[in-house]
Amino acid sequence: MAKANVSPGMQQYLDIKKDYPDAFLLFRMGDFYELFYEDAVKAAQILEIGLTSRNKNADNPIPMAGVPYHSVQQYIDVLIDLGHKVAIAEQMEDPKQAVGVVKREVVQVITPGTAVDSSRPDSPNNFLVAVDFDGKAYGLSYMDVSTGEFFATDLADFASVKSEIQNLKAKEVLLGFELSEEEQAILVKQLNLLLSFEMTALEDSPLIDHQLTAVELSAAGKLLHYVHQTQLRELSHLQALVHYDIKDYLQMSYATKSSLDLLENARTGKKHGSLYWLLDETKTAMGMRLLRAWIDRPLVTSEAILERQEIIQVFLNAFIERTDLSDSLKGVYDIERLSSRVSFGKANPKDLLQLGHTLAKVPYIKAILEAFNSPYLDKLVNQIDTLPELEHLIRSAIDPDAPATINEGNIIRTGFDERLDHYRKVMREGTGWIADIETKERQASGISNLKIDYNKKDGYYFHVTNSNLGMVPDHFFRKATLKNSERYGTAELAKIEGQMLEAREESSSLEYDIFMRIRAQVETYIDRLQQLAKALATVDVLQSLAVVAEKNHYVRPLFNQESKIAIDNGRHAVVEKVLGVQEYIPNSISFGPQTSIQLITGPNMSGKSTYMRQLALTVIMAQIGSFVAAESASLPLFDAIFTRIGAADDLISGQSTFMVEMMEANHAIKRATPHSLILFDELGRGTATYDGMALAQSIIEYIHDRVGAKTMFATHYHELTELSTKLTKLVNVHVATLEKDGNVTFLHKIAEGPADKSYGIHVARIAGLPEDLLARADTVLTKLEAQSQARESVLSTTEVRETQQLANQQLSLFTDDGSSSEIIKRLESVDVMNLTPIQAMTVLYELKKLL
């Protein structure tokens, strides 16, 4: 990639850049990282930094932009957040000692999925995902390079892959198989991530268990290869690969988690107002991340849930000890990410001090846990390794006032190394020795204004003015002559100066070497530190759940095998927290073993959606091991939650509200089991009234007859309430209202039976619509109700079957016609649920041509 008339330094830049064409190359030159050519032009615009040029007077000056080395991280963060890659080229030798061009090499490539530096201590996991396909199944592997966590699973279809990527909130995905450009574009737009291809797998890694499926191994190997290619060093903090099965956790799509505000408020994108916000009383960054993981993946086995419940109960029963435990955890730093900084060779003295400070607290934390005297805590207590030898090393080696950088000195504590102590003594006492020499020579020479000065060129010297030159002693030797004075030295002064300079240089070099050795020793403890981090994070989350349970008067839920739901005076935990206990109206929820569907009717704003979400959050809280917002609760264990709550177009995919509704309904009824929970709110409203009602009825019947999942179905189609006479496992409930003197009060209380009215006009009145408009609406409503009284809107199950048979007979009349046969074949090949509106129009046009 040589260019004519470029300097050797620029040729070096071009040679390196050709290996990293898709990354911004930050090229270290002295105290700056420079960018050139197109990188400089783009970076100047993105980072809002000055754009200049190299060789300004040349015919084709080279665009150039730069950032100071000490603030480079903030600029890297901006580029990474925008989805770019950044390659860091460092100087590999001292420029003062270099012969010719300073040797430079890329030491790291930072990408959205491998970024580890963050100014936020509470920042969530940053997962890099790799996906492979063997023609039958997909292998998916993911890693957080900042913590070393490493996982893999296999999935049956690409829809599951996309869902898992969304749930992980991955910023970068590696594909190990070919994907069309159209599919790539859709994936990038839908998931808002950086997509790369990685076809080379790292084989025979000790981190990978070869008992995994071949496609999992391939995905994990390709992920590891990419990490090694970008980080360009051995990473000792990477943990052994853990296989997981999505069926081991309560399955929820990203849309479901979003609609339930599990990790963030869907309307604001903030933590406040989410279940995570409610449950977070953690004291450590590790605990915060683990709590997010628990909320994201609730359990499905009672043994693991009960184990968590027992520990929460132990903490609840001992307020003083739990408070002491919480206070002690406040001083625990992020061991996981400190370990990764050690592994990356980036840990500074402050990092080691934080690690040492944490280790100093661990014995006391362990003692507190032992003081609970509970067998349920034995497992956790045994996992807490106090690492006394590492704590002693850091405490005895690192000065408590050490700076954040490793080149400022004053890192190593006095008394740790004899040579270093000697050099420091020379530097400390050398100043006094020089003062003594100055006093002695002033008295001996009789030169009253004789003094010793220092500069980099001449070192230490005696300053003698011209008027006193005749009094200069014989053992003085001239070092420099100035206009009005001369500079002299002596053998004694030179000796002391030599000792001080040697001490300064040797001290700096020795202190750096000692710190590197200590950091290398710390690295040997990374495995034990990571195990300690997991144990402390678990303790932190469990104490957090205990604190939340006590503050909010939650109860311990029970689990039953009778497939019944019995929640007495339950509350929507998040809404209650926002409104306050006094304002919130609780609701009991009951599903008997023979009840599978609650059909919920009632006006808008009355609380139907809150009631449905209340059940979902209660289930999720129970299955992460938390206590729940109710007076009592008995639940079955659910394997999945499916929701359709709220309406919105998917503009990126070109899908309308109704199409999204139907796709989510299809996803639910095809994947749900009798152990699942389905929440459908106003399904069918995105199309014409009778179309919507017909679909709603058919979906309810399908769930009732074929799926058997516990289902809440909220609707404004009051005609559907008649289904309770035909479907034995369906019950009607409604949101109670109080109507008096023309005024309507929503009681936000669930009652048995169907609602008698929708009160839509009353809601419109609350919204402030003009009274004359509302009066006209009342007139129209009365007329429409009169017209529909004689008409039965819900077909019986028998009528549905007869109608279907008639449709089949009518269709068979045309089977001998060639064009009809072609139309049927074309229709059978169409994947209706995955059509965009534009694609649907194209299909209709093709069918029309066949007529």
From Swiss-Prot:
A single MF term (Gene Ontology): ATP-dependent DNA damage sensor activity
One Pfam family linked to the record: MutS_III
PROSITE patterns: DNA_MISMATCH_REPAIR_2
SUPFAM superfamilies (UniProt xref): DNA repair protein MutS, domain I (SSF55271), DNA repair protein MutS, domain II (SSF53150), DNA repair protein MutS, domain III (SSF48334), P-loop containing nucleoside triphosphate hydrolases (SSF52540)
GO CC annotation, single: cytosol
Keyword vocabulary terms for this entry: ATP-binding, DNA damage, DNA repair, DNA-binding, Nucleotide-binding
Binding site for ATP: 602-609
Regions crossing the membrane: none
CDD domains (UniProt xref): ABC_MutS1 (cd03284)
DNA-binding among keywords: yes
SMART domains: MUTSac (SM00534), MUTSd (SM00533)
Any Gene Ontology biological process: mismatch repair
Function statement: This protein is involved in the repair of mismatches in DNA. It is possible that it carries out the mismatch recognition step. This protein has a weak ATPase activity.
PANTHER family: DNA MISMATCH REPAIR PROTEIN MSH1, MITOCHONDRIAL, DNA MISMATCH REPAIR PROTEIN MUTS FAMILY MEMBER
Family statement: Belongs to the DNA mismatch repair MutS family.
Stated name of the protein: DNA mismatch repair protein MutS
